[in-house]
Structures are given as structure tokens and as C-alpha cells.
Amino acid sequence: MKFIGHDSDIINYLVNDLTLLNSTLKQFKKHEVDGEPAISLMFELAYTEADVMLVFRNVFKNGFDGNPAAEPYNVDSCKFYHIGSKIYLSLDPDESEDGHDGISEDDNDFVLASHVEGYIFEEGMGE
């Protein structure tokens, strides 16, 4: 496991170097970090032998119903933004013209948090 960034760094990393598009959400976990609500999402990336885990800390809103990773969940589209002092990820975003940029009330499967940390698990990396 290797730390690959936090907040804007991880967003830029997953836009430029790797992508969540066409990945599979393979783990979803609600928990606490330092006494604050957190959500961890593990993605199996499509174009590399790597998995990426995102840990959202100090979660304000959780727009996931149940455990989305209970069944295969393919990421066909997503929003991943730094909005003001918050981090926003939607795995089922509103793609209409009105909802394309920013948070939309029609976005689904989302998390809004103060911070996000990213970790990469590469095959043969030795943990």
C-alpha cells in the first residue's frame, strides 16, 4: 500500500495519471477515523493491475444506499471535485446540462466530506 495524495492532489492524480472510469467498486465501508465519520471505497482499476482506496474523512453527507459493493458496481461516470473546503464524489452523477458541473440534487451514490486520502495497492508491491 502506498499513499498517493490527499484532497486536491488525489483528485488531480485520478484525473491525470489514473482514472476511476470503468473501474469496479469492490469495497464500501462506513467507519470512524479519529472519532469522526468516515467512508472507505476500494476500486479495482480497469487499465492497470492496481486497486485504489479512497478514505473520506469527516463525512457530511453519505448518498449511498446500503452497501453498493455487495454486487458488482461498475463506474461508468463520476464527479470528483474539491468544492470550497469540501471534497465531493458521485459515482452516479446527473449528466444533464444543468447538473454537469458541481453538485446536483439528481446526483446519486455520493459522499461529501472535509478530506479524502488516496492509497494505491499494486500487484507484486509487497505490503
Model region roles, listed by residue range:
Residues 1-127:
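Surface-exposed, interaction-prone regions used to assemble/regulate multi-protein complexes
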